[in-house]
């Protein structure tokens, strides 16, 4: 055989190597692209599930729990008037003391900002639900509207005044009285800041006044200014009001409202079981505060006003005692209830308001000899606001769960796929008739079964990635924040 004429094709080793390099480069590029895609994968299905859980959690504590608290306070559950009686219903709010830069001066500014947001929201939400579900005919604030109001300049005070009215907007066709000052608003006694007192009365109204509501006379007395013994410009107005009221005719039952409680002997006049603190009522005084009004002034107030009942604030905790005072040669008694603070940051675990129901029909007669009414014309009930700290604890647990879930998904992907993704695939995937969705034969190995799971839409990448963890965590955070914003600003 002759081979000379056969053409020989000689392959170039150089071209072969270049082809191999190009092939490997293309494969490596594809692998790098697939890896980059895996790293940037966002697990929308799992993020949506966690988002729904957050929606349920926040809705429960910001709506359901609040409605439940209002339901427990419904007037019909504790009022005991004759059938068909139309009572006048009153809500008493003590020491809201909206937070400002004077509240916690040692804390970082960012911490104070978020604390203020939470406290303001608690006030605003509770006020809205009280006005909607309980719908009192009249609302009275018992002082300490602000925390550092006595120290602010006019510019800052106006800013906080606007903020206060945004938190507690007045309801149309309902009376809301905010004119009673507290020591955080103007100071106390000899240390009352006269300019702060004048500013407060200019915007909120006279600090000592009386008005009729529900066939009762409400007496708002600025006992703080009345206690000033050095500056007649401060004490003159409440002194004149008290003297003029004593000389006037007041046929209706009187209800006294004061910020600071009247004098008592805490060893003899105990506060009762509704008080959180087990210690006796404190009798203390200091710079711009005093826990009770002096004994002589207290007796003068009781004698001249002759209240059926009086309500005070300042202490932040509940206290109910009985006062006695002389009246026409006899001894008359009057209950005093120190109302719990409605704020969540006043050192008590359960903020509350005091509800007051008044029923005094025109045919009710007075016993002339003792100056007492033939029957009781008021009923009152302590109304607890929702536990603010339980909601915060649950949100922190929710945050911890969310972080752990996202971390488990990214740092233990094989375990996640074997446990979570398998269950999700079994529960949410519907058979569509394809053989790929049918149960695998028993002869097929477990490795093939696991391989089929990796193609499931619920499976996660089997490689660990901090970058992907951060991306999914940020996406979840950004998705949940609008829920908080909605409940904290709109609802």
From Swiss-Prot:
Residue sites binding a divalent metal cation 1 per the record: 95, 144, 323
Location of the protein in the cell: Membrane
Topology, Extracellular side: 61-391, 487-491
Record note on cofactor: Binds 2 divalent metal cations.
EC number: 3.1.-.-
Membrane topology reported for the UniProt record: Multi-pass membrane protein
Protein name stated in the entry: Cell division control protein 1
């Amino acid at each position: 055989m002759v081979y000379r004429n056969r053409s020989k094709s000689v392959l170039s080793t150089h071209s072969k190597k270049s082809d191999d390099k190009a092939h490997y480069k293309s494969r490596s590029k594809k692998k790098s692209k697939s890896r980059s895609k895996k790293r940037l994968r966002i697990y929308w299905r799992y993020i949506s599930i966690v988002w729904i859980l957050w929606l349920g959690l926040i809705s429960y504590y910001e709506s359901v729990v609040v409605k439940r608290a209002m339901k427990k306070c419904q007037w019909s559950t504790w009022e005991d008037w004759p059938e068909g009686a139309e009572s006048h219903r009153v809500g008493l709010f003590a020491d809201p003391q909206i937070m400002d830069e004077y509240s916690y001066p040692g804390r970082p500014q960012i911490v104070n900002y978020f604390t203020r947001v939470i406290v303001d929201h608690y006030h605003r939400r509770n006020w809205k639900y009280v006005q909607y579900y309980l719908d009192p005919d009249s609302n009275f604030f018992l002082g300490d509207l602000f925390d550092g109001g006595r120290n602010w300049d006019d510019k800052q005070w106006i800013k906080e005044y606007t903020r206060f009215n945004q938190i507690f907007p007045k309801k149309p066709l309902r009376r809301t009285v905010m004119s009673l000052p507290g020591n955080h608003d103007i100071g106390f006694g000899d240390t009352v800041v006269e300019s702060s007192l004048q500013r407060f009365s200019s915007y909120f109204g006279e600090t000592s006044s009386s008005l009729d509501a529900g066939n009762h006379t409400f007496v708002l007395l600025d006992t703080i200014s009345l206690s000033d013994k050095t500056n007649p410009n401060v004490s003159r107005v409440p002194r004149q009001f008290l003297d003029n009221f004593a000389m006037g005719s007041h046929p209706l039952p009187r209800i006294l409202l004061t910020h600071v409680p009247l004098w008592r002997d805490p060893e003899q006049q105990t506060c009762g079981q509704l008080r959180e603190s087990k210690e006796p009522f404190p009798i203390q005084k200091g710079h711009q505060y005093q826990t009770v009004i002096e004994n002589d002034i207290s007796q003068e107030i009781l004698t001249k006003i002759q209240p059926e009942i009086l309500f005070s604030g300042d202490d932040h905790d509940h206290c109910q005692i009985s006062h006695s005072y002389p009246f026409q040669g006899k001894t008359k008694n009057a209950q005093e209830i120190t109302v719990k603070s409605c704020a969540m940051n006043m050192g008590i675990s359960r903020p509350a308001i005091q509800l007051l129901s008044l029923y005094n029909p025109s045919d009710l007669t007075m016993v002339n000899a003792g100056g007492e009414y033939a029957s009781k014309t008021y009923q009152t009930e302590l109304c607890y606001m929702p536990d603010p700290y339980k909601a915060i604890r649950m949100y922190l647990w929710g945050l911890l769960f969310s972080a752990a879930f996202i971390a488990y998904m990214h740092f233990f992907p094989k375990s996640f796929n074997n446990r979570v993704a398998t269950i999700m695939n079994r529960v949410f995937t519907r058979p569509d008739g394809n053989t790929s969705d049918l149960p695998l034969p028993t002869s097929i190995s477990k490795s093939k079964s696991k391989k089929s799971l990796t193609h499931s839409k619920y499976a996660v990448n089997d490689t660990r990635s901090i970058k992907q963890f951060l991306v999914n965590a940020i996406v979840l955070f950004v998705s949940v924040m609008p829920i908080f914003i909605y409940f904290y600003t709109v609802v």
